[in-house]
C-alpha cells in the first residue's frame, strides 16, 4: 500500500530590511507580492522598528497570515543598542557598522531556528541596500540571495560604472567632468547621483550604496522598482553586464502590490486619518498644485517662503504637505506666510498615491525622490522638479529630458542658490496653463498607460515576478502550520 505524502511546503523566502520607513515599505510590498504567488515569506527587521510596526499593523510575531496563494509573517531581532538610544539609531555612521556586526549573527541564528525548530528551511534571502551584508550571510550559509534596489536602473548603472571605473567621473581636480554611460543620456557633473561627486558632504551614504554594488555578483536576482518601457535602454544594457535575467524590473511596486486582493500590510506605519481626499473632491478638475518634499529632504525656511509666494503669484490652489520633523536633526517645522494659507490646504500627512491619482491634481512640486518619481509618472501627473541630492538630481533629468513630463526648478543643493518666487511662479504657470502644460500632461498620461500595462496580468513586471517564483520552484500548497511539521521543501538550491 502506498503511503499518502504531505503536500510540499512552499519555498521559504526571508526578507531582511534596514530599519526605516523608506526601506521597510518597498520590501514589504515585495514580500506581499511574493506571498501572493505561493511563497512562504518571513519579513525581518530590528526589534526597535518592530515595536512601531506592531502598533500600526497590530501584527503578531512569527504568526503566519495567508496572502493570496502563500503566507506572510514577521520576525524581529535585537539590534544590540540600549532601548532608549535613538541617537545611535538615527546616526548612519554609528548604526550601519553596528547593525552589520550584530545582524550577521542574528540572521544566521534565525535561519538556523527555522530550519531546526519549525522545519521550514530558508531557500532564499532578499535584502535592501543598507543591509548589504545579508549577501555575505547567504554566501556563508550557501543560500541564494537577491536584492531589492529602490532607485532607478539609471542610478544603479551610475554607481556600477563608478565603482568599476568603466567611464570617467568628476574628481577633486576635475570636478566638472560630464558622464556618458551606454543606454543613458549624457549626465552633466551635477546630474550624476550627487553622492558620487567628490564635493558631496554625504560620503557615508556613498559608502553604504557602494557596499551593495560590491556584492551584486553574489545575487542571482536584482529587483528594481521600475518597468521595462520606462528605462528600456539602460535595463537592456545593464542586463548584458550581468548574468542573463538577473535584472528584474518589478515596478511600479506600489501598483503591483494593489493587484493582491487580500492586504494584510498597512505599509505606512505613521499613517493617520487622511484629511485630503474630501477636500480634493471639492476642487475643480486639474486645479490643484500638490507640493511635497518627502520625509528626508529639508529646505531652508527662506526657500519655503519663496515657493509659497511663487504659488501665490501664480494664482493656483495648493495642497502642501508640511511634515513634523521626525529625524532627530533638530530642524524647525516649516511655516507658511499667513497671506498664502487661504489659497489652499496644509496637512502634515496625506496618502500620496491617492492624491496623485485624484482628478483635481494638476501637477506635483517634488524633490524627485524615486518613490515620488514613480508615483507621479505612473499616475499621469506632470512635475515641477526641485531635486536636492542623491538620486534626485538624476531622476529630474529623466522626468525633464527623457520622459518629458516635468520642468526644472532647481539643479540640486550643489547649486547653492535661493530659487526666487518669480521663477517658481513662472514654472507653475508653464506646467498648468498653455501648450507646454498640454504636452506635459499628454506625455504623463502615456507613461501612466505604460505603467498599468506593466503590472497587468502578463505585463512585463508581472512576468518578471512569475519567472522569479518559478525559479524558486513554487508549487500549489496546502495549509502551512505555524509550528513544526514534516513537510519536504519544494525546489532546490541547485536550480540556481
Curated annotation (Swiss-Prot):
Binding-site positions, UDP-alpha-D-glucose: 352, 367, 370-372, 375, 391-392
Enzyme class: transferase
Description of what induces expression: Induced by the auxin indole-3-butyric acid (IBA).
Recorded GO CC terms: cytoplasm
Matches recorded under Pfam families: UDPGT
Catalytic function, reaction form: (E)-sinapate + UDP-alpha-D-glucose = 1-O-(trans-sinapoyl)-beta-D-glucose + UDP
Single GO BP term: response to toxic substance
Organs and tissues of expression: Expressed in roots, cotyledons, leaf veins and trichomes.
UniProt function note: Sinapate glucosyltransferase (SGT) required for the biosynthesis of the glucose ester sinapoylglucose and subsequently sinapoylmalate and sinapoylcholine. Is the major SGT activity in plant. Plays an important role in sinapoylation of anthocyanins. Sinapoylglucose produced by UGT84A2 is a significant source of sinapoyl moieties for anthocyanins. Indole-3-butyric acid (IBA)-specific glucosyltransferase that catalyzes the glucosylation of the auxin IBA, but not indole-3-acetic acid (IAA).
Name the record gives this protein: UDP-glycosyltransferase 84A2
Lineage, top ranks: Eukaryota, Viridiplantae, Streptophyta, Embryophyta, Tracheophyta
Gene that produces this protein: UGT84A2
Amino acid at each position: 500500500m502506498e503511503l499518502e505524502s504531505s503536500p510540499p511546503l512552499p519555498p521559504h523566502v526571508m526578507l531582511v530590511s534596514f530599519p526605516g520607513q523608506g526601506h521597510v515599505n518597498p520590501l514589504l510590498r515585495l514580500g506581499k507580492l511574493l506571498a501572493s504567488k505561493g511563497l512562504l515569506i518571513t519579513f525581518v527587521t530590528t526589534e526597535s522598528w518592530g515595536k512601531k510596526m506592531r502598533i500600526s499593523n497590530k501584527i503578531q510575531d512569527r504568526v503566519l497570515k495567508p496572502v493570496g496563494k502563500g503566507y506572510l509573517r514577521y520576525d524581529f531581532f535585537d539590534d544590540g543598542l540600549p532601548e532608549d538610544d535613538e541617537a545611535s539609531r538615527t546616526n548612519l555612521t554609528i548604526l550601519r557598522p553596528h547593525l552589520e556586526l550584530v545582524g550577521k549573527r542574528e540572521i544566521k541564528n534565525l535561519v538556523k531556528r527555522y530550519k531546526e525548530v519549525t522545519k521550514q528551511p530558508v531557500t532564499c534571502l532578499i535584502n535592501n541596500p543598507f543591509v548589504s551584508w545579508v549577501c555575505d550571510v547567504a554566501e556563508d550559509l550557501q543560500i541564494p540571495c537577491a536584492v531589492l534596489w529602490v532607485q532607478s536602473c539609471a542610478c544603479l548603472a551610475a554607481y556600477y560604472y563608478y565603482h568599476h571605473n568603466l567611464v570617467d567621473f568628476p574628481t577633486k581636480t576635475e570636478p566638472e567632468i560630464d558622464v556618458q554611460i551606454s543606454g543613458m543620456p549624457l549626465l552633466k557633473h551635477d546630474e550624476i547621483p550627487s553622492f558620487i561627486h567628490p564635493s558631496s558632504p554625504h560620503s557615508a551614504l556613498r559608502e553604504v550604496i557602494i557596499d551593495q554594488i560590491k556584492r551584486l555578483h553574489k545575487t542571482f536576482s536584482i529587483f528594481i522598482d521600475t518597468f521595462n518601457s520606462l528605462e528600456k535602454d539602460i535595463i537592456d544594457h545593464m542586463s548584458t553586464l550581468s548574468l542573463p535575467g538577473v535584472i528584474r524590473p518589478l515596478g511600479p511596486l506600489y501598483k503591483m502590490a494593489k493587484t493582491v486582493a487580500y492586504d494584510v500590510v498597512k505599509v505606512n506605519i505613521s499613517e493617520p486619518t487622511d484629511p485630503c481626499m474630501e477636500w480634493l473632491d471639492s476642487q475643480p478638475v486639474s486645479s490643484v498644485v500638490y507640493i511635497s518634499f518627502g520625509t528626508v529632504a529639508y529646505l531652508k525656511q527662506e526657500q519655503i517662503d519663496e515657493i509659497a509666494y511663487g504659488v501665490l503669484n501664480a494664482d493656483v490652489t495648493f495642497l502642501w504637505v508640511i511634515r513634523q520633523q521626525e529625524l532627530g536633526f533638530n530642524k524647525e517645522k516649516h511655516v507658511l506666510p499667513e497671506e498664502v494659507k487661504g489659497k489652499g490646504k496644509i496637512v502634515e500627512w496625506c496618502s500620496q498615491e491617492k492624491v496623485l491619482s485624484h482628478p483635481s491634481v494638476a501637477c506635483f512640486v517634488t524633490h524627485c525622490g524615486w518613490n515620488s518619481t514613480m508615483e507621479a509618472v505612473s499616475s499621469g501627473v506632470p512635475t515641477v522638479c526641485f531635486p536636492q541630492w542623491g538620486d534626485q538630481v538624476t531622476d529630474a533629468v529623466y522626468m525633464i529630458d527623457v520622459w518629458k513630463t516635468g520642468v526644472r526648478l532647481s539643479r540640486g543643493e550643489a547649486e547653492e542658490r535661493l530659487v526666487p518666487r518669480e521663477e517658481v511662479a513662472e514654472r507653475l504657470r508653464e506646467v498648468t496653463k498653455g501648450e507646454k502644460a498640454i504636452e506635459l500632461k499628454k506625455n504623463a498620461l502615456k507613461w501612466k498607460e505604460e505603467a498599468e500595462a506593466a503590472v497587468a496580468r502578463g505585463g512585463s513586471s508581472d512576468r518578471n515576478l512569475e519567472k522569479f517564483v518559478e525559479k524558486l520552484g513554487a508549487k500549489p500548497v496546502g495549509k502551512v502550520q505555524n509550528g513544526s511539521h514534516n513537510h519536504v521543501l519544494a525546489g532546490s538550491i541547485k536550480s540556481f
